[in-house]
Amino acid sequence: SSLFINYKGRKMLIDCGEGTQIAMKKYNCGFKAIDLILITHLHGDHIIGLIGLLQTMGNSGKTDDLTIVGPVGIIDAMNAIKVLVEYLPYRVYVIENPKEKFSLEHDILKDIEISTIDLEHSTECIGYSLYFKRKAKFDRQKAMSNEVPQILWKKLQEQDTVIYNDKTYYSSMVLGDERKGIKLSFITDTRPTFEI
């Protein structure tokens, strides 16, 4: 099993069972821009596709870092995979059994807050919630009432501050109220638990 997520051109996977890369090829998902793989547990139907996928990612020209997150045992699993996959042209960071909310430092993925929950399964198993933060929408009236030059409108939607003609302009001068984010939870292979 596997869930593929495309967020602003960057890609993530939750689990990587056998056949994951075949399905990804079939639907033209691409391999180069995968930045994050979240593993729920170490049963074969959730991790066995990782060996081939890591090699395919390297063969596709990936050089950006990859982060793999998983339950207790993911570090040992990755060490075993390193024996089979001797060379990768990108760095792999492994986070084992995270308990606190976290975000990645990647320019785009830093907008995603990830939290975990322990699940009830025959082995260590993690459920994931991804909270996709959303920026406030552009407010034309606000920009005009704050006398922000139109040439800066786009920049202030992307940057917090812009200095123009010796005057400082802030994104809050052109943006409306904060928007509620989008939450995606992936809970699999568990008995019913109160925490869910």
Task: Identify the residue ranges that each predicted region occupies.
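Short acidic-hydrophobic surface loop/beta-edge motif
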Residues: 5, 101-109, 162
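Binuclear metal-ion centers of metallo-dependent hydrolases, dominated by the metallo-beta-lactamase
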Residues: 99-103, 194-196
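Conserved beta-strand hairpin/beta-sheet module of binuclear metal-dependent hydrolase folds
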Residues: 1-27, 65, 128-130, 178-187
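Active-site metal-binding loops of divalent metal-dependent hydrolases
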Residues: 18-19, 42, 73, 143, ...
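Active-site-proximal loop/helix segment associated with metal-binding centers of metalloenzymes
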Residues: 109-195
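Alpha-helical elements of the RecA-like P-loop NTPase motor core of helicases
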Residues: 22, 48-51, 76-79, 126, ...
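A gly/proline- and charged-residue-enriched helix-loop-helix capping module
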Residues: 76-82, 97-101
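Active-site metal-binding motif and surrounding structural segment of the metallo-beta-lactamase
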Residues: 19-69, 93-101
